[in-house]
């Protein structure tokens, strides 16, 4: 994100809704350190990143998804399963850019949204967890260069992609339940 939108006038901002393992102050501080480390690794003026750390209730999530400044959802999910936040956001009728792998491809329709290319790669030993993510398993890794180009294209031609995604709200309401 920093590399793709550095030194850009009117660059988009990133709202990062995440946690590592807990919603503790220590966890939040560690995530901020990672963001700042990435920012320092990029030469040039980097766009803003806003960290949303912690649990939001359904009304708060709905307000976030439908906020007028929230233009799209981007997820480089590695294939963790269903992807309820993706389904919820797709109901807004705003663009979704997401990995072309896992449970969400059942409802993220490329007629409305963008499925990001990539490939299956072995899970690194440091991310393995016995009984959950075992040795020999793979997950999906987005092609970062292509995804970066796609994000820039969506930003540059947002009206086109917003129009394309508009029908997703009706599609999600009539074809899928939450």
Label for each model-derived stretch:
Residues 138-146, 156-178:
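A charged, aromatic-enriched C-terminal amphipathic alpha-helix characteristic of glycosyltransferases
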Residues 22-67, 71:
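Nucleotide-activated donor-binding/catalytic signature segment of Leloir-type glycosyltransferases, i.e.
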Residues 62, 87-95, 102-106:
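Short alpha-helical segment that forms part of, or immediately flanks, the ligand-binding pocket
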Residues 1-10, 34, 150:
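Short hydrophobic signal-anchor/transmembrane segments that target glycosyltransferases
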Residues 78:
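Aromatic "clamp/platform" in nucleotide-sugar-dependent glycosyltransferases that forms part
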Residues 69-71, 93, 100:
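A short alpha->beta transition loop at the rim of the catalytic pocket in nucleotide-sugar-dependent
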Residues 95-98, 114-115:
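Short hydrophobic beta-strand element within catalytic cores of glycosyltransferases
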